Amino acid sequence: RGLGDVYKRQVIELMGGTTPAKQYILEALEAGKQVVTANKDLLAEHGEEVMGMADKMHADLQFEAAVAGAIPIIRPLKQSMAGNNITEIIGIVNGTTNYILTKMTESGMNYKDALAKATELGYAEADPTADVEGYDAGRKMAIMSSIAFNSRVTFNQVYTEGITKITAEDIKYAK
């Protein structure tokens, strides 16, 4: 029956990526469905359009898990802090890179060994590129910035730099 089926009130998007997820989410929102997604790729690239459709249709779009999953940040940015003059967003938003940098700092591990340990413990994905090159953090920052500053911020507008070239000497100087 499709996403417009009157018996379906919620749509949970689990596909990832931007295509065809964007089409399905827009279709569900247009039909007035509540949509739940953790798709930071989609929100970082097409958040304005998706959130705009949710507003236009008075549909509920939930995406708290897309940014700092264990820390509720989206709702406070939208509601509790809406009247504040936010000037910057600072935070640790990627657990994999946080773990790697902590191991390099506290245990003196080199990057390669710290990444291997993170992978062994299940903190790093099989392909950790999005984490260690800063793409994951950049997408999260684009989403949070769009909300906090009430302005369209895309992933491409967020400066990202990975941690793959950080050495023990860099850590020493950072201390």
Language-model region placement:
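N-terminal Rossmann-like NAD(P) cofactor-binding module of classical short-chain dehydrogenase/reductase
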Residues: 11-12
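Short glycine-/small-residue-rich Rossmann-like dinucleotide-binding loops
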Residues: 15-16
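Conserved active-site and cofactor/substrate-binding residues in soluble primary-metabolism enzymes
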Residues: 45, 68, 72, 84, ...
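Short, small-residue-biased leader/transition segments that mark boundaries at the very start
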Residues: 2-7
